[in-house]
Amino acid sequence: MLVTGLEILRKARAEGYGVGAFNTNNMEFTQAILEAAEEMKSPVILALSEGAMKYGGRALTRMVVALAQEARVPVAVHLDHGSSYESVLKALREGFTSVMIDKSHEDFETNVRETKRVVEAAHAVGVTVEAELGRLAGIEEHVAVDEKDALLTNPEEARIFMERTGADYLAVAIGTSHGAYKGKGRPFIDHPRLARIAKLVPAPLVLHGASAVPQELVERFRAAGGEIGEASGIHPEDIKKAISLGIAKINTDTDLRLAFTALVRETLGKNPKEFDPRKYLGPAREAVKEVVKSRMELFGSVGRA
């Protein structure tokens, strides 16, 4: 069933579990995510980026919305990292039930203004909104920000931001980063900062860049001929602790891509004469489903539908 993001996430934060937001780019990813959700009886969020929407066009967005409507568990269709008001309006027209406006690279006042504009438009049609807030290193309005605080969310600013914008859930910058880590040192979550934010912001909180990047997946990808540098993700125990502190939505993309691509490579490597797409996309779809199921177990969303 198709529901708003807030319907899923408000319950998750109140009851202390997390819900996965899994990025999809095609039919196989969408099917894998929804099949996993139904098998695990878990709510889920299908996330589409602007890049995915450009790649698949209206055929993709209509398919994702239609499959979400048919699902036997609560599903939100979410715009991931919407860069503009126009991008959000496009998602609203396509039937999305959750949208993100990401103006975190702008100054605080611009972020507030642009986010509030999106909130007003989305709420007018019953759609809920995710916003993002971070800090840049340097000095702004006589406030010095140390390098260790660069890009990290300021708890008091988060409270003010949510009060002024009316956003429904907030993506916080607490140390994670998008994609697989390559030469950036061990990824981390600033749990004390998260705890301070959660005390001031009662809304559901969102963790981006939360893929685990399991070494077995990395090695399987390499063994099948893939090339990837040193890569690591967020430790499962760090994710669990973050959920206990108020994180309700956890984004995952890299792990799904690794699993899917590794299986396609493996299948074609073992069967070089194969040219039936179903024979290599099918196993890849199953690999994605298994990753999604394991993430749902980690997040504690199993049986919560």
Swiss-Prot record:
Gene3D superfamilies assigned to the protein according to its UniProt record, in alphabetical order: Aldolase class I
Details of cofactor binding: Binds 2 Zn(2+) ions per subunit. One is catalytic and the other provides a structural contribution.
Annotated residues for binding of Zn(2+) 2: D102, E132
Keyword Lyase on entry: yes
EC number assigned by the record: 4.1.2.13
Active site: D80
SUPFAM superfamilies: Aldolase
Binding site for dihydroxyacetone phosphate: G179, G209, A210, S211, N251, T252, D253, T254
Function of the protein: Catalyzes the aldol condensation of dihydroxyacetone phosphate (DHAP or glycerone-phosphate) with glyceraldehyde 3-phosphate (G3P) to form fructose 1,6-bisphosphate (FBP) in gluconeogenesis and the reverse reaction in glycolysis.
Protein name: Fructose-bisphosphate aldolase
Upper classification of the organism: Bacteria, Thermotogati, Deinococcota, Deinococci, Thermales
